[in-house]
Amino acid sequence: MTNIRKTHPLLKIVNHSFIDLPAPSNISAWWNFGSLLGLCLLIQILTGLFLAMHYTSDTTTAFSSVTHICRDVNYGWLIRYMHANGACLFFICLFLHVGRGLYYGSYTYFETWNIGVILLFAVMATAFMGYVLPWGQMSFWGATVITNLLSAIPYIGTTLVEWIWGGFSVDKATLTRFSPFHFILPFIIAALVMVHLLFLHETGSNNPSGLISDSDKIPFHPYYTIKDVLGVLLLLLLFMTLVLFTPDLLGDPDNYAPANPLNTPPHIKPEWYFLFAYAILRSIPNKLGGVLALVFSILILMLFPILHVSKQRSMMFRPLSQCLFWILAADLFTLTWIGGQPVEHPFITIGQVASILYFMIILFALPSISMLENKLLKW
């Protein structure tokens, strides 16, 4: 008799996706981040659901409702900090997942990669709206600054901003609409994840060598389920250490003060995971130019399949490209640091140099070095 998992209409889908899925035999721990991101999304949806039961999306009570969750709800402090730090962990896994895709040439799976970039935008939008909900000082001013960027769009900009605000400033209407959007977006993200996996399973996984591995496949279960469990345990260890010992390590102290439109914080900055893009935005003196650079800093990921000119898919055997990749990684760390610094000398200059370097490496240096490596292959 055939196993039920292979015949049942629903179990069959699960079987083909997670059990009998043919996977390359040589994929490393860098391939764990897909499952870890799934875990992060699950944690965020569950903790968010419990927070939504106690949260009120009204400017007069939002801040005190978060305080009430932390003080009066059973394990409310734990749920709140799991949700806040879960977002941080989500982005750490996301950046590592994207980095792995860039290093090993996974972007040549065009549809999977583009859905992934759309997912990145969706997660960033969700995180931004979630940051506004506690209605602290940085929530209010962050929302004001970031939404105000849309006013740089010619002709319709100002109208668009007021339409998003629901008035002439960030106020009750803004908070009321951000709350349902923040609630529904994770479910849209979950649906997009399904599409992401659908396209991935059409082609099969990439592997560190970048070579076709059709002749050397092993079943996903038990080999990679066990490997993923190790990743999950390490992630949960890091996560719970963060939540239970230093829950405010990655947060902003300003957000413990209720939102006050009459008092501007000395340095408005978003959460750490947006700082690299924020630094690129600030490094251009023109408002529209800054907004375009901000959007393009993420959208540029979609150009990688077009900019790939190397005869080898992975960077595993391309030392020159490897050097550039790690310079790019260091540049992103620099941009993240600069985004958190005040707008003054020498940070302005460092930010501008790092921003130019970011675009130069991706648009010119990597393709040029790839061409050089192609030439060196013939020698």
Swiss-Prot record:
Its cofactor is heme b. This is Cytochrome b. One of its GO terms (cellular component) is respiratory chain complex III. Heme b b566 binds at residues 97, 196. Heme b b562 binds at residues 83, 182. The cytochrome bc1 complex contains 11 subunits: 3 respiratory subunits (MT-CYB, CYC1 and UQCRFS1), 2 core proteins (UQCRC1 and UQCRC2) and 6 low-molecular weight proteins (UQCRH/QCR6, UQCRB/QCR7, UQCRQ/QCR8, UQCR10/QCR9, UQCR11/QCR10 and a cleavage product of UQCRFS1). This cytochrome bc1 complex then forms a dimer. PROSITE patterns: CYTB_CTER, CYTB_NTER. It comes from the Eukaryota. Pfam families: Cytochrom_B_C, Cytochrome_B. Heme 1 (or BL or b562) is low-potential and absorbs at about 562 nm, and heme 2 (or BH or b566) is high-potential and absorbs at about 566 nm. It is found in: Mitochondrion inner membrane. The chain crosses the membrane at residues 33-53, 77-98, 113-133, 178-198, 226-246, 288-308, 320-340, 347-367.
